[in-house]
């Protein structure tokens, strides 16, 4: 259920865009992302840092989009978030010695540090490519294609990359842990 709730702002953005326009959809995105934050606080008594970070960026770029009536701001948000994710993974690993991907998954999966570092760098590359690809689509193709890319393209790419990361990690798990996962 919690994972579904994460997609609600994206679904609302897409639906409102199809019936109205980018500015109404952006306003709806800001409101629903804020409501999502409130729901998390009421339901779970905590707000994830990533949720708060996303809300702040959505609020900032969405607010600028609506205020200036310029869709360039909301288009840039996708790239900024992806580049910040990539930088966050890089800086946490090589600046502070913490591999965030490993921290998120190490409770369930044990793999050598070198493997975690490769997965971390792969995600850095993935987020960077997504950010750059978004720039290309946002500013070289029609707005409707960008909305479809943002909603379906990036989501699909992320799901595929997550699966590929899982397959890569699975190949490097100790034999006894592979047996546990098959049960």
Swiss-Prot record:
Disulfide bonds: none annotated. The chain crosses the membrane at residues 22-44, 54-74, 76-96, 119-139, 149-169. It comes from the Bacteria. InterPro entries: YciB. Keywords: Cell inner membrane, Cell membrane, Membrane, Transmembrane, Transmembrane helix. The keyword Aminoacyl-tRNA synthetase does not apply. It is a multi-pass membrane protein. It is found in: Cell inner membrane. GO terms for cellular component: plasma membrane. Belongs to the YciB family. Plays a role in cell envelope biogenesis, maintenance of cell envelope integrity and membrane homeostasis. This is Inner membrane-spanning protein YciB. It comes from Aeromonas salmonicida (strain A449). The gene is yciB.
